[in-house]
Amino acid sequence: MLHLRSDYLMQSSSNNVLKQVEFNTIAASFGSFSTILTEYNRYILQELGYHDNIKNLPQNNGLRNLAQGFIQAWRLYNNEDAAILFLTLDVTYNISDQRWIEFEIKRLSPRTKVVRKTFNDIYKRGQLNNKHELVIDNTIISVIYFREGYVPDHYPTNCEWDARLMMERSTAIKCPDIKFHLVGQKKVQQELTKPGVLELFLTETAKIEAVREAFVNIHGLEFDENGDKAVQMALSNPKMYVLKPQREGGGNNYYDNDVKEMMLKMKDCKDRSGYILMERIFPPLSMGYMISAGGPNPPPLIDIVSELGIYGILISESGNIIMNKQTGHLIRSKSPKSNEGGILAGSGALDCPYLLD
């Protein structure tokens, strides 16, 4: 099972065509908040008397669709006594986003049990029975939803790695399993931009061209002619590129002069092949109010840039596609002065699209 979010920015130099920033295949957050925020903004428009404008806010059923995806996976496991496991940290700052999903699962399917466990819980109390089912606290686990486990800090000891291996070896449906987890790496994004790669997965020329139009140029940094050329491009014009490692969770990328400094440090080091050099996207500016805890009241009208996220769910079994659908959308807005758009870090805000055409 895969719950993903593909993120896009408009490229000003290409007539504001949407360009893919990245795709997230593990712990793609804010799927529930995006639905709640859409309903909130509809309510605000109604209270302010802008009844005719409500239709300009597109429906967003991301929360319901995500919950239905988990229920579908739970049913495929074919054991009504089994539970869906949310893998979390001991302290989870984004717990509200997770709880909405849990509550929606219970609302749509009261029979479905949801439990929250940590890596440490799995390591200490989890085990595989003779059918390779994952059992913890006498409960069989049918679906594992990874909300953690995507950064090295989540694996401080071998205990966490052993717990991850136990879960991967189990018959539980993983969201995602290790294969889908690795698909979200930046090197995979780079490979998909190469000529002939999309043709391995798509056959219709129009679809191939539409997908390829969303790509920006991405360069590998291997020790070959192309890699050396990419290094020189970054050194000569660092403001036009983003340097990205194989990391998730935000705050890992390099921009502007940091690109040059990092490239100088590792241009002769084998570590450089673990990075990609991505053409930078310069989105158009719009005006908006950014409301944040502890911020000015009332908030000032400021320049913002907005990133679109499209959610999707994929469920497959033995090579057969059972569910493959777009489930919802998200807008994250931030100051153009901020390179990262982290919501929890306070450098961005959740937003909604308002359609004009």
Outline where the language-model segments fall.
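Extended, Lys/Arg-enriched charged tracts that mediate electrostatic binding to polyanionic substrates
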Residues: 1-10
